[in-house]
Amino acid sequence: MPYLASLARQCTRFADWTESDTGQASATQYVSQFQGDSNHTVRNDCAPSPTCQSTADNLFRQARTAGLTAVNYVEGATTACSSSGNATKHVPAMYFKGADDAAHCAEQVQPYKNFDINHLPNFAFVTPTMCNDGHDCSNTVVDAWVATNVGAVLNSATYAQGRTLVEIWYDEAHPVPNLYIAPTAYTGSVATPVTYRSTLRLWQDSLGLGCLSGSCGSTNLRPLAGT
């Protein structure tokens, strides 16, 4: 993957990134990522339902309560609050149903076609299709998608302003493949052990939000990455 390799030479990489919920399915990893602790109802990539959901506080709710915008963009979807054309297990915002989460689903889960580089929310989480994320297609396809889509962000006026952090990571493996890209990001590999909850803490710190559960005791990646 030549384009991703070129990015890796220009940004921060964490060499010892462990899954927060080792051995769990994708949906569990994603939901835990956004709420900061293990979820015991979202199991085996089940579809969102009364028996497969989370009522815990989460980054989307935190941002909304603070007057910020947080959006999960879903490639392949054509309508809001839908994972049609994609895999629901990779769309974490669909699983949060506590407080007023469900009432805000349409604003927090948007088709990727609505992703506008010049009008970004405070936090954007992009879910590529199962082909473009490498699950069903080759690394060549993945690299081409990243070159087109991430490349557009990195070449934008918004990114040039110096206030945008771009992250690329996978939901499983050890070490978890990851890249942290920003105008201020350090270059090279960081040996400090981290987890997905460390990333949640970075997001919260960057947005001026408090920590949640497991993120409170996790290593903050922000000073390590220079972002």
Language-model segment annotations:
Residues 1-227:
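Flexible, surface-exposed loop/gating regions in the mature catalytic domains
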